[in-house]
Amino acid sequence: MTRPFAASEYDAHGTAIGETRPVPFATRPVLQGTHGMVAAGHYLSAAIGQRVLEQGGNAVDAGIAAGFALTVLKPQSNGIGGEVPILIHLARERRSVAINGQGWAPAAATIDWFTSHGVRLIPSDGLLPAMVPAQFASWCTALLQFGTASLADVLGPAIELAESGFPMYTALRNGILKVAERFKAEWPTSGAIYLPLAADGEVIRNPDWARTMKAVLDAGLRESSREAAIRASLDYFYRGPVAEQALAFSSSRAFPDATGDAHRGLHSLEDWAEYGASGTRVEEPVSATYRGVTVQKCGPWSQGPVLLQQLKLLEGFDLAALGHNTAEYLHVYLECAKLAFADRERYYGDPAFASVPLERLLSDEYAAERRRLIDQEQACNELRPGSIAPEAVGTAAWPVVTGDTTHVDAVDRWGNLFAATPSGGWIGSSPVVEGLGFPLGTRGQMFSLDPEHPNALAPRKRPRTTLSPSLA
C-alpha cells in the first residue's frame, strides 16, 4: 500500500519529495499560495476575505470581512446577535491573543428570577435566554487592536450582500424549512424576510439588515480617524438606535418558548451599553504541547481546553500502532474525550466568576492519573470528572433547538493567523427583531440554575460556550 505523505513532504508542484512511487490518488489539488488564504463556511465569504488580502489587508482584516459576510450568508448558523470567540497569532510579535467574544447575562437574569417564575431549565428558544450580542463588539475589538482596515472595508461587502442578495442554497433552505411553520404562526418578523421560501438559486435579500448595518457604519463617517470611526459605530450599536430598537422589541412582546409559556426578554439599555464599552476581553490563549506541537485555544469560558485535555490524554497512547480509525483507535479516542468532557461539566465556567483549575487539568501528572481510568477493552458509560465521585449521565429536560455554527480562518503573507467560530443569533431559535433584520442569541440556555455549579447563572456572567477555534 502506498504510504501517505504529510503536506510538508510535497514540493510546490505536488510531487512527493524524495519519493519515486506513485502519489496517492486525489481528486482535488493541494491549495497553495504565497499571498495568503481564507477558508470560510460559505464560498462568497471566503472570496470576500481573499479580496481584502489582495487589497493589502492582513489576516485579521480578511477574517473579519469574511465573518461579517457569514452573518448574512449563513443566518441558519450564526448572526450579528450572537457571539464569536477569536484566536489571532501575531507573527511579528511572536505571540497569540484570544478575544472573549461571548456576551453576558442581563442584570435582571438571576437564578431567583427564573425559579420564582417556575422556570427550572433555561429554554433554548425565544427571548428569555438572550445574552447581550457579542459578535459586533468582538469583530470591532479585533479590528481596532490588530487590524489595519476601516470598518467600511470589512463591513461594506456584507451590507452589499444583504442589499443586492445572493443565491439561495440547500442548507439555508432546509434551515428555514425546519422553522417555516413557526415563522408563520409565532414569528411574523422572521417570515417577512425568509418567506415565502425561495427555490435553490433564487436570489434572496435582507434589506432590514442592510439598512441597520449601513446606519451603524454611517455613525462613524464624520470621525477623523479609523479608530474613532469604529468606536462611534460601536456606540451606535450598543448605546444608540440598534440597542433601543432591540430592547423595545424584546420588552414589548412575549413569545412562546420551550417552557410552554411566553416570555419577554430581560435586557436593559445599561446591559448593552456596559458591554459595548468594556465587555469584550482580550486574553492570553490557553495552550498545551502535543507531540512537539503547541496547540492554542480560548479559555474555560469556551470548550477550548477540552481539546487540550484530550490531547494530553492521547499523548500517552501509541496511536500509530493502533491504526488510524480502527476500532481500537476510536475506542481510546472516545474514552479520552469522555474524561475531558466530564471535567468540562464539573469545572469549566466564566473565570471571572468561577475558579477553574486549568494548571492542574492540563498537567502531565493529572493526565497520567486520568489515563489510568481508561479500560482499553470496555467503554465507560459514567460521567467521571476528576477528584469527585462518578455520576450517572443525564439528559436535559427541554428539547434543544438545533442550529449550527460556522467558521473562518485566514493567513496572510506576513504569517499572521486568524481563527474565529461565529455562532448563535441564528434564525431558528429566536424571532428576527422587527426592523433590524437579525434575531438575538439564545446562549443563556447553557447556564445552570444550580447556584453551586461553576456555570451557574449570574448577572454580567458569560455562559460556558461550546465554540472552540484553534491555532497550532
Give a label for each model feature.
Residues 2-47, 51, 57-232, 237-295, ...:
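Noncatalytic scaffold domains of N-terminal-nucleophile
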Residues 15-18, 206, 243, 247, ...:
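Internal maturation/activation junctions in enzymes
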Residues 141-148, 160, 164, 218, ...:
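Short, well-ordered loop/turn and helix-capping segments at boundaries between secondary-structure elements
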Residues 281-282, 402-405, 465-467:
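Short, small/polar residue-rich loop motifs at catalytic or cofactor-binding pockets
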